[in-house]
Amino acid sequence: ALYKKDFQSIGGHDPLYAPQSKEDSDIFNRFQLNGYKFVQTWEGCVYHMTCRGSRYNPTLTTVGKESDEWLAQNNKSARNFIRKWGHFVKHTDTMKPIVPKRYDVGFVAINCDEYRLMLLEPWCDTIYTDVPYDRYIQAEQKNTKFNLKKKLKRYEDQKTNDVIVEFDASKLTTQNFEFFNMLQLMLEDSGVIGSVEFDIFKLKVNNLKDYGRGLIDINDKWYLEKLV
């Protein structure tokens, strides 16, 4: 429970996730960054309005099977959460949000292709690549409010991000791909300006400015400039 004014002061739920999925994790991250204190009770009871969505809609799927519609929306919202926060949902065992600092990260990916581009794009603020990306933008832009024309750049374009990560996309594996989910935490823990190598990745850290507060209010200028 919280006061209505506190909910409204940060713009309420982010329509980025409409109609559902990850909007709750997003707003709890924003509550925490805005200094709200969390109190958990085992004596409360909240009715969750089950079976009102499309997850197990018997008109869309068989009983007990998640509908393709729900799975597609869940994946769409997960990708948008990563685009916004730079990582997937993180929390403690008691569900308290873990919110790493939010850095400005650019990927420089050689030997890329459209499939790898689809996997990589959400995890950075800018991606400089050697694969043509117009077709990807045309297919993916309808799934996000983030401006993909601003985000995708040619390999030879000037690299302007605070943190640059260079790698050969053809060498990505299931194991080393987890690097992207941990990158914001790793940068925060290291606090090091300069160049470093890890596995297939070459990092050039020019600045460790934290942009996290720009994600609290959905009307913040820094955040809005990333959207269409």
Predicted regions and their residues:
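Short, solvent-exposed loop/turn segments at secondary-structure junctions
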Residues: 7, 45-46, 114-115, 133-135, ...
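Short, well-ordered secondary-structure micro-motifs within conserved domains or adaptor modules
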Residues: 153-188, 200-201
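C-terminal, non-catalytic tails of nucleotide-sugar-dependent glycosyltransferases
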Residues: 1, 37-38, 54-115, 119-130, ...
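Alpha-helical elements of Rossmann-like donor-binding domains used by nucleotide-donor carbohydrate transfer enzymes
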Residues: 26-30, 76, 80, 182
